[in-house]
Amino acid sequence: MGSRNSSSAGSGSGDPSEGLTRRGAGLRRSEEEEEEDEDVDLAQVLAYLLRRGQVRLVQGGGAANLQFIQALLDSEEENDRAWDGRLGDRYNPPVDATPDTRELECNEIKTQVELATGQLGLRRAAQKHSFPRMLHQRERGLCHRGSFSLGEQSRVISHFLPNDLGFTDSYSQKAFCGIYSKDGQIFMSACQDQTIRLYDCRYGRFRKFKSIKARDVGWSVLDVAFTPDGSHFLYSSWSDYIHICNIYGEGDTHTALDLRPDERRFAVFSIAVSSDGREVLGGANDGCLYVFDREQNRRTLQIESHEDDVNAVAFADISSQILFSGGDDAICKVWDRRTMREDDPKPVGALAGHQDGITFIDSKGDARYLISNSKDQTIKLWDIRRFSSREGMEASRQAATQQNWDYRWQQVPKKAWRKLKLPGDSSLMTYRGHGVLHTLIRCRFSPIHSTGQQFIYSGCSTGKVVVYDLLSGHIVKKLTNHKACVRDVSWHPFEEKIVSSSWDGNLRLWQYRQAEYFQDDMPESEECASAPAPVPRSSTPFSSPQ
């Protein structure tokens, strides 16, 4: 099957995995705003516009100017040195000291999380200081069946969040994607060097066992996903195709899934696989949702879903009947797979409240709740039973249209720091404290088995991993070591380990490590005392059920 690789692979100085979405209304800027925002090299901006076909060169200016512009084009497309994701290091995202929890307090998700973490019915003081009391009750046999319940285990594990760097792997170019498999046995990393690396994570290991050269890649691999049975993986790029490849076996068999787009320059920014592995969902730069049926081996749907790039797609739960999409129009839409039609592309509802484009969506897995990351520097928590009104959708669209800065190469304007809720915002909660610059930064719910999904965690343009408490909105952990933006983050489904993938070319595994040993913890015998101190284990009191 032939491939048509997009020549626009380098489009975008920060992350070309998006189309240029600066609207005419956003071109007008006041003198005060121009002084506040960081200056941008006009020659580099012009080079970007030329590459996107939005500006043409006419006669005049001399050959020297043409050569200069071409040199910029070559440096950005081939060497990718113009924007390396380090701009965000100078940006200190404002933290919301008093998150508004009024909507969340009245919603069932509060009860769900408290039940899943053993906090339901406990007073606030008991929730914070109940660890020794829990151990004492277990020793007295007062726990259910003599051991901690799943909720109590999750509450204990919250005391052992990853806090230390356990493993690092370095690449020659930017790391774009990194996710654990559903069972936690494999970690997959995708890099701008067009290589997909697989790591064996069984029995506490993190060892690379396979490297696969991706095919038909323009600029970089943009998204990856595992098949439900864990035997294959999929990846997308600036290409007409989504590719699927085997994980096990001696050879690498790449199968191209042709989406047959109408656009000449085409990219799939986000992919998801149905629970039965039959359908592959993709969101693309032409504003469309694509559905590819693997059994029929053809594209079955092309839905005009958003007014701009579709940056994020996700299935709501294991049924794969409800799905979510988010785009640069700042709207998150909810679709029913059973009623999706190309001739009548109507979602069942929409969620509005963001003021700029959505970069990622993660479902809680219960077909009710989801979170979205946005260029407005916030994460929002949604309940799909609370769709937005027309007023809310119009307010969100208007706010996105009036944005007059580009998050790929500019600093966040000070006016975007304001804590402002749009009319008709139907979100349950808004989380502030991380930066979203340069690229489509991801955020996710923490695992249900080990944490009861009591946390939300996100990458950050300042090179951090930021962990929020879902119910309070406060930041409970920041993991700092990267020198450029962290684009992707993934929490092990059963262990207290987080892997961050950064544009500094590094993959970092974070785990819990005890800060110091106390005298009571040390052995008393002389024979044991002469031995070296044991290395703290990375696992928490509850091991993986693998």
From Swiss-Prot:
Keywords: Phosphoprotein, Repeat, Ubl conjugation pathway, WD repeat
Signal peptide: none
One GO-annotated biological process of the protein: protein ubiquitination
WD repeat spans: 170-210, 216-258, 263-302, 305-345, 353-392, 435-480, 481-520
One Gene Ontology CC term in the entry: Cul4-RING E3 ubiquitin ligase complex
Residue numbers bearing the Phosphoserine modification: S75
Superkingdom, taxonomy of origin: Eukaryota
Keyword Phosphoprotein on entry: yes
Pfam families documented for this protein: WD40 (PF00400)
Amino acid composition bias (Polar residues), ranges on this chain: 537-546
Compositionally biased region (Low complexity): 1-19
Region (Disordered): 1-40, 523-546
Disulfide bonds: none
Phosphoprotein listed as a keyword: yes
Pathway(s) where this gene product acts: Protein modification; protein ubiquitination
PANTHER family linked to this entry: DDB1- AND CUL4-ASSOCIATED FACTOR 11 (PTHR19847:SF7)
Known partners and oligomeric status: Interacts with DDB1 and CUL4A.
General function of this protein: May function as a substrate receptor for CUL4-DDB1 E3 ubiquitin-protein ligase complex.
Protein name: DDB1- and CUL4-associated factor 11
Species of the source: Pongo abelii (Sumatran orangutan)
Lineage, highest ranks first: Eukaryota, Metazoa, Chordata, Craniata, Vertebrata
